[in-house]
Amino acid sequence: MASAALLSLTLADFRSYERARLETGGRSVYLFGANGAGKTNLLEAISLLSPGKGLRGVSLAEVGRRLPGEAVGRAWAVAAEVQSGEDAPVRIGTGVEQGGAARRTVRLEGETVPPGRLADHVRPIWLTPAQDRLFLEAASERRRFFDRLVFAGEPAHAANANGYDKAQRERMRLLVDAAETGAPADAAWLTALEARLAEFGALLAQARARTLLALQAEIDGRGDRPFPLARLGLTGEWERMALEGAPFAEIELKLAQALASARARDGAAGRALTGPHRGDLAIFHVEKDRPAAECSTGEQKALILNLVLAQAARLSRAESAPNPVILLDEVAAHLDLTRRAALADELTALKLQAFLTGTDESLFDHLKGRALGVRVGDAGLTTLEDE
């Protein structure tokens, strides 16, 4: 395990910030201030120090600062100094060099590198108000949420998902064209694409199964915490095979066979009706003896928080990757005093760096002396003195 913490964070023309710099000293940070002050923007900046679109999931063109009358956002940058174990701090950064650009540049110690290299130094995991509707949204949202948990522990999962999606698009283009024109699709090409889909699909299913089992074990060991226990499940056929211990070759073979037999059906439907892209995450509240979707909003929030904390705990024991950095946006406001105190104790015990936001300073009373307090407002970022 390599400890990792952000020592500093610098923003330039990012969202509401023309310029901002936060020195953390490697400590956890709680950010408080009025709605719209820019607290979540700071968490989003940290989340972009990882591959992907960050915690808001928007296009890169949207995050550049834009003044009235400007058609597109400006070029923007996020940079950080990251301390990993006993090594010297490392400078990482990302941004776009031209306003409205769709691709970002990533730099490590001033050298341009692929975005995947960010995961070698920091792994943000987050919980935001957008995830409050996780149990009400379509299966794709829960699948995307769970895949982020998988990716944090197995970075190759993202590349496998991209490979699967690309092969899926190519296969569907052939099948839809054949369905519309009546001309047969190239069978050899379809077989080759389905072989790729089966390979990537089996890898995805097994990675999801490994992650689910690890998270369930972590959650089961957390019975003494004042957060609800959850039983996790994956509903997809291929994930079920992986959970039951089916070897990779068996999943790959059966998926390839299923795809081949579904060509006509998929072409007529205009979408693939079998594969790991159809799976779903199921969460069951053990004490309430009911699915999470039937629980109160408060219990749903607590279930997801416990899942994120379990994820942080399991990743903190990884041997070959940096510790996660936890981003909790407006989470404390939805917890009662007992759970708020438990959250502070949990974050302290995990010895991981966390960034939390809330409108009221009193929400973080249990973190005072254990984390750095920062007021976010019109005057910028104001660091509080420790009491």
From Swiss-Prot:
- UniProt GO BP: DNA replication; DNA synthesis involved in DNA repair; double-strand break repair; SOS response
| Pfam families, per database record | SMC_N
Return the SMART domains for the record: AAA (SM00382)
**Role, per record:** The RecF protein is involved in DNA metabolism; it is required for DNA replication and normal SOS inducibility. RecF binds preferentially to single-stranded, linear DNA. It also seems to bind ATP.
Q: Name one GO molecular function term.
A: ATP binding
Disrupted-gene phenotype: Increased susceptibility to UV light.
Residues crossing the lipid bilayer are none
Q: Which of this chain's residues are annotated to bind ATP?
A: 33-40
What PROSITE patterns does this protein's entry cite? Answer: RECF_1 (PS00617), RECF_2 (PS00618)
DNA repair keyword on record? yes
Show the GO cellular component annotation of the record.
cytoplasm
**Location relative to the cell:** Cytoplasm
Mind listing the UniProt keywords for this protein, alphabetically?
Answer: ATP-binding, Cytoplasm, DNA damage, DNA repair, DNA replication, DNA-binding, Nucleotide-binding, SOS response
Q: Which family does it belong to?
A: Belongs to the RecF family.
Q: What is this protein called?
A: DNA replication and repair protein RecF
Query: Where is this chain primarily localised?
Result: cytoplasm
Question: Which gene name belongs to this protein?
Answer: recF
